[in-house]
Amino acid sequence: MGDLIFPINPGAALAIHVALSAGIVAAIIVVAAWLREKRSGARADVPYEGGVLPAAPQQGPVNAPYFLIAALFVIFDMEAAILFAWAVAARDTGWLGLIEAAVFIGVLLLALVYLWADGALDWHKERRR
């Protein structure tokens, strides 16, 4: 049925799609660079966060344990997306799909236990290495 609507080679359609996508991205980058406000000077190089200018220069690296928690959230959030897709097709996959989902959940639980034992989920404690 697809041949009746679009009589084009699938490879050519993919190439056209990739070329158009790359062209749109390039056009957006060029327009953004052309329209941005061009400022120079000492004030333009000062970091700006929340409307408050920094009182003193930053001394040393910033301890950011929330980055690790955010990365773990993204990893385990993907679990929910994959399991949702499995749940939609659960009747079609049968027992084999159930076993595969159980193995997937088991591997993620092992990863969670490892991260917990490693101290990756402790906010204020120093992680063991």
UniProtKB/Swiss-Prot annotation:
InterPro entries reported for this sequence: NAD(P)H_OxRDtase_bac/plastid, NADH_UbQ/plastoQ_OxRdtase_su3, NDAH_ubi_oxred_su3_sf
GO CC, any one term: NADH dehydrogenase complex
One matching Pfam family: Oxidored_q4
Enzyme class: translocase
Disulfide bonding pattern of the chain: none
Topology relative to the membrane: Multi-pass membrane protein
EC number: 7.1.1.-
GO molecular function terms listed in the Swiss-Prot or TrEMBL record: NADH dehydrogenase (ubiquinone) activity; NADH:ubiquinone reductase (non-electrogenic) activity; quinone binding
Subcellular localization(s) per the UniProt record: Cell inner membrane
Positions of transmembrane segments: 14-34, 67-87, 95-115
Keywords: Cell inner membrane, Cell membrane, Membrane, NAD, Quinone, Translocase, Transmembrane, Transmembrane helix, Transport, Ubiquinone
Domain of life of the native organism: Bacteria
Catalytic activity annotation: a quinone + NADH + 5 H(+)(in) = a quinol + NAD(+) + 4 H(+)(out)
Subunit structure: NDH-1 is composed of 14 different subunits. Subunits NuoA, H, J, K, L, M, N constitute the membrane sector of the complex.
Role of this protein: NDH-1 shuttles electrons from NADH, via FMN and iron-sulfur (Fe-S) centers, to quinones in the respiratory chain. The immediate electron acceptor for the enzyme in this species is believed to be ubiquinone. Couples the redox reaction to proton translocation (for every two electrons transferred, four hydrogen ions are translocated across the cytoplasmic membrane), and thus conserves the redox energy in a proton gradient.
Family classification: Belongs to the complex I subunit 3 family.
Protein name: NADH-quinone oxidoreductase subunit A
Organism (species): Rhodopseudomonas palustris (strain BisB5)
